[in-house]
Amino acid sequence: MENTQIRYAKLLLDYCLEIKPGDKLYIATSMLAEPLIREVYRYATQLGAQTEIDFQFSGKSKMFFDNAPDELLTSEPVFHKKALEEFDAYLNIRAPYNLNETSNIDPEKRKKRSEALQEINNIYFERTADRHAPGALRRCLCQYPTEASAQKANMSLEEYSAFVYQACHLNAENPKAEWLKIREDQQRIKEYLDKVKEMQYKSDKTDIRFSVEGRTWINSDGQANMPSGEVFSAPVEDSVNGKVYFSYPSIYMGRDVSGISLWVENGKIIKWDAEEGGEVLDQVFSIAGANYFGEVAIGTNYNIRQSTRNILFDEKIGGTIHMAVGQSYKQCGGLNRSSIHWDMITDMTESGQIYADGKLIYEKGKFLI
């Protein structure tokens, strides 16, 4: 059997990004991911792709916020924008040095930077909406195990590496075949939900309703995110009503927020509370468009069995649902626009239920359809 990094590289390029000769591939990562990057670059070159790599180094983000004058803080990153406008494929390999690096940055600076990136975010969401459309950008977000991520997950690096590779099915004889089977299984759920008009998430601390009439559900099958395992859509913006409690911790710009409760009327989040980090919510909901939901979703990856305080994995946990405030996905038919897209997750395995047009379709973390 090939070593893990070779298998990972082939899965990312063959399955996730479907790299072809002549493709322009843009990779964003850190120097810590070098073992994987070497194999990705080697294989991309063998496939005939032109590859450019944007490397982060330790402390770069904090250095930028600490030293950038306002005119730089509010400007667009030139190469990043050009790559998102012109390249064929974008691979974002998360390999952090320090997940708390920007935790103490001035909130006003964060807000200015977020607003400055709005146009680039719009380009990204437009070009990734349909990967099969002419001129589309095929994208994939994945994880390379580092000490920082392992510490955040309360694991050793060895344990965390095993967790990441299991979540991606890299230990399977044929990882690509595993993801093709997941695609087939989730397609049945997607097609059922596409016919639904109104949904309700319900549990001990949650009772929230929303319309998905005219919206499209997406089968997240490991191409855009590796790992994946979810179905998601965008609620009709003014249809969301009720209260939702998120049992998993959420992280925004390096800051922890736990036990989030949101109250919603006619789509707008009118009240919020948190057991920890409530001041972060005050900052978030001052951002344009953040008071409305951009995504509703159901996690289906039962190879992920615990929270690691990493949204790439946590939102896919089998037996959870999540909702995101802010930017909605164009491919779902969502209309909300914002410089933020922040996912929040809750466990459904104890008392959770999902109703579709009044019919119970999901209970205690499992679909009934």
Protein language model regions, located:
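Active-site bordering "gate/hinge" segments
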Residues: 1-241
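Short, glycine-/Ser/Thr-/acidic-enriched flexible segments
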Residues: 32, 96-98, 146, 215-217, ...
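Short polybasic amphipathic segments
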Residues: 199-201, 260, 270, 350-360
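Short acidic-glycine loop/turn motifs at beta-strand connectors
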Residues: 204-205, 214, 264-266, 356-359
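Oxyanion-binding "anion nests"
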Residues: 227-272
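Active-site lining segments that contact anionic ligands and/or coordinate catalytic metals
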Residues: 241, 257-259, 266-269, 291-295, ...
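Dual-mode signal for accessory low-complexity, basic/Gly-rich regions
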Residues: 271-335
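Intrinsically disordered terminal and processing segments
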Residues: 322-369
